[in-house]
Amino acid sequence: MKKLYLKTHGCQMNEYDSAKMADVLKFSHGLELTEDPAVADVFLLNTCSVREKAQTKVFSELGRWRPFKEKRPHVVIGVGGCVASQEGETILKQAPFVDIVFGPQTLHRLPDLLDSVIQKRKSVVDITFPEIEKFDRLPQPRAEGPSAFVSIMEGCSKYCTFCVVPYTRGEEISRPFDDVIAEVASLCEQGVREITLLGQNVNDYCGLMHDGQVADLALLIHYLAAMDNIERIRFTTSHPSAFSENLIDAYAEEPKLANHLHLPVQSGSDRILAAMKRNYTVLEYKSKIRKLRAVRPDISLSSDFIIGFPGETDADFEATMNLIHDMGFDHSFSFIYSPRPGTPAAQLPDDVPMAVKKERLAILQNRINVKAAEISQSMVGTQQRILVTGPSKKYPDQLSGRTENNRVVNFNGDTPLIGQMVTIKIKEARPYSLWGEIC
């Protein structure tokens, strides 16, 4: 059996895409995943262009793969994802040993691309945007455990000034409503109990229904919650400007919708938000959270922050810190700003010194870490309903799962509990997890 070595950079959407790459090549060519590159026949790198030095990271990885191809010339190396979409033929110029370059929207064509390389021994590039075609040509989803990702839309049409996603993944396109329902139903039959709905801007979902009507994210959640085997529903990533009243109503009406929301705000300064073209103000963001907490008072809130965006002053940063205090975020993905090629913000002077960026990032992360520790400590003594996902990564003799507010809980238990919802009494708050006992 031939082997596939697959490495993924970036977000949950990329993780989902990588799983589909493995599925489609297993179905078409019988390729089995391996964690040992020395025995691999096909190498795939699924890339992310959001963070700093993304291209450098890609070519460094490819450099580590080159000796495998020199030693075994039949090896096929492919580069996919957002860097592939952004760089295209440039990848072949800088790394001529690469055989396949494909974008996020053409991963379903991997079997044909692989056949072309094998037959012609010539590199191929396909970074087109064939809309929603890829979902129609993928194999049936395979569950890897009781929790699964389901992509419900692709691309983004917000065009924030710092972001490359609209240029690398294309405009927003929603999957048909019935297709999403069918995929979730198939996963349920395989034992999945928790679904995470994915999209670059997931709450802009507008799925065409069989009767010609259009379903928004809230309606999709209502339908999924009606499935008996679904115990919990999550979604990511949301955009504040598209966070609707219907979605707030769904939190009020559907107990299966997890008591956690990731809603990236990026900055607490209206001036910086305008420069980012985020299309909301701090007051509007706060208003949506206030309405949400009126129906879910104890909901856990996480966010994204970009530190040191061009023109960010001490006052702008202080406004961000004030927002963090007011909102009580207990987790964040926070990054130092770096210009992404081809974005409007890349034309702005990157005028915040790196030392200042690093200092601000450390201050922000410390504030959020303190809040997260406080919340974790407050959970000691409470009973939490968790979905048991498998053995603990850190403590293999224990089982592990996640609370509704997305905290890892480790506990002693037997393997038949995997895939079940259990109630755990939290006994201890640890730095990156909780520990408890079955009630």
Swiss-Prot record:
Print the keywords alphabetically.
4Fe-4S, Cytoplasm, Iron, Iron-sulfur, Metal-binding, S-adenosyl-L-methionine, Transferase, tRNA processing
The record, for InterPro entries, names: Elp3/MiaA/NifB-like_rSAM, Methylthiotransferase, Methylthiotransferase_CS, Methylthiotransferase_N, Methylthiotransferase_N_sf, MiaB_methiolase, rSAM, rSAM_horseshoe
Q: What is its EC number?
A: 2.8.4.3
Q: Which residues form the Radical SAM core domain?
A: 142-374
**Required co-factor?**
[4Fe-4S] cluster
The entry's localization annotation reads: Cytoplasm
Q: What sort of enzyme, by top EC class, is this?
A: transferase
* Free-text cofactor note: Binds 2 [4Fe-4S] clusters. One cluster is coordinated with 3 cysteines and an exchangeable S-adenosyl-L-methionine.
**GO cellular component terms listed in the entry, alphabetical order:** cytosol
**Positions bound to [4Fe-4S] cluster 1:** 11, 48, 82
Using the record's annotation, list all stretches that form the MTTase N-terminal domain: 2-119
Q: What is its main location?
A: cytoplasm
Q: So what does this thing catalyse?
A: N(6)-dimethylallyladenosine(37) in tRNA + (sulfur carrier)-SH + AH2 + 2 S-adenosyl-L-methionine = 2-methylsulfanyl-N(6)-dimethylallyladenosine(37) in tRNA + (sulfur carrier)-H + 5'-deoxyadenosine + L-methionine + A + S-adenosyl-L-homocysteine + 2 H(+)
Share what the entry says about its subunit structure, partners included.
Monomer.
NCBIfam families documented for this protein:
miaB-methiolase, MiaB/RimO family radical SAM methylthiotransferase
The protein's job, in short, is: Catalyzes the methylthiolation of N6-(dimethylallyl)adenosine (i(6)A), leading to the formation of 2-methylthio-N6-(dimethylallyl)adenosine (ms(2)i(6)A) at position 37 in tRNAs that read codons beginning with uridine.
- Give the UniProt family note: Belongs to the methylthiotransferase family. MiaB subfamily.
Q: What is the official name of this protein in its record?
A: tRNA-2-methylthio-N(6)-dimethylallyladenosine synthase
Q: Which organism is it from?
A: Coxiella burnetii (strain Dugway 5J108-111)
- Organism lineage string: Bacteria, Pseudomonadati, Pseudomonadota, Gammaproteobacteria, Legionellales
